[in-house]
Amino acid sequence: MLAPLCTRCGAPTVWPVERCIECAGRRLAFASARAAVHYAGPAKAVVRAWKERGVRPLAALAADLVVAHVPRPAADVITYIPPDGDRSRRRGHQPAAGLARELALRWDLPAARLLTRVRRVGRQTGLPLEERRRNIRGAFGAVGRVHGTVVLVDDVYTTGATVTAASSALSAAGARAVHVVTFARTIR
């Protein structure tokens, strides 16, 4: 995504700001968030094909676009948003995990499964921001102690509710900082 961006959440802004209207006043558990592309048009079609139709090679394409548009965060490890078990079984793959593996190769970072779902969550699609936050709060737990700075990968940043909940779990487990990287971002 083209600058200027909010330094914190990565939302497009008219001029560079430390905290934009989207993240000002919110407690964000991550240090920064960046996305390669706007979630619209062709990017939306790519995500749908990748997630719902299982076109796994699109993870490599998405990783190439991320590397081209997102500076590599200074980090010790890369991880991903763990999928809902039912959706993962139905799809037969884990899109965020695939993107994390591809980025780990390109950024020469170790990839690790640092998070797990500790409770089931209803679908987030179509929910307003406050409902998304309530729905996802407390849904993630760390697999063990987390050391150093973490890159947290997901396919799409919509409201930040999912990555905030996951970042909270990583921080509670010892992460020094969490930098969120997604393929696409919804612009509100």
Predicted regions and their residues:
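Glycine-rich phosphate/pyrophosphate-handling loop used in enzymes and phosphotransfer proteins
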Residues: M1-R188
